[in-house]
Design a protein with these regions (language model features):
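Mobile cap/lid helix-loop segments that gate and shape the active-site cleft of serine hydrolases
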Residues: 91-128, 135
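Short beta-strand/loop motif that positions the catalytic acidic residue
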Residues: 133, 139-141, 145
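Catalytic histidine neighborhood in serine/cysteine hydrolases
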Residues: 106, 160-181
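Alpha/beta-hydrolase-fold enzymes
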Residues: 2-102
């Protein structure tokens, strides 16, 4: 029931639009390579913060027609006030990330996919083995997700030996989670 060191038992786990296996990251593959990760390690690897607004802008530009240009045309060119939209408000409330954690995450997940290699990823010095997580899991993927493609979310099922339920829903990364499937 444990992925690494002894811990309190957990009855089940839920993964909503989440990668465990980073072998199919969709369009993000275009942006994350060795040079990019080294740059981020130099910038943030020893301390500091990854500004949340930078990360939010990255995700917005993965769907520029919907999340950027639509507002440039409406707000800037036409002078229209956008209608209130709870999902976009929530999406704009970004969180800064600890720099060393962000640099570790890029290298160990997106670049090297170490989370699915038993013992290759270490958290607080403890090797992680997803194959030891033998609890029931619920995994949800959104069909139009631009951050975690549904095929990437589904790939997690190969690495968890316990009972699994995978649900594919409609919509995108955020809306798919909060709307019924």
């Amino acid at each position: 029931r444990r992925a690494a060191a002894p811990a309190l038992p957990v009855a089940s786990a839920t993964f909503l639009t989440t990668f465990l296996d980073f072998s199919d990251t969709g369009v993000l593959d275009v942006f994350i390579d060795e040079a990019f990760v080294k740059l981020r390690e130099m910038q943030f690897g020893q301390g500091g913060l990854m500004p949340g607004h930078d990360l939010a802008a990255t995700f917005s530009f993965l769907r520029p027609n919907d999340l950027v240009w639509n507002y440039v045309v409406g707000n800037y060119l036409k002078g229209e006030t956008p209608p209130p939209f709870d999902l976009l408000y929530w999406n704009s409330d970004s969180t800064n990330l600890p720099g060393p954690m962000y640099a570790w995450y890029l290298r160990n997940t997106y670049l090297e996919n170490n989370l699915v290699k038993p013992g290759h990823a270490r958290v607080c010095g403890v090797p992680v083995d997803l194959g030891r997580i033998d609890i029931p899991v619920y995994i949800y993927g959104s069909r139009e997700d631009h951050i975690v493609p549904v095929t990437g979310a589904y790939a997690s099922t190969r690495h968890l030996p316990g009972a699994k339920r995978f649900v594919m829903g409609a919509s995108g990364h955020i809306a798919g989670v909060i709307n019924p499937p």
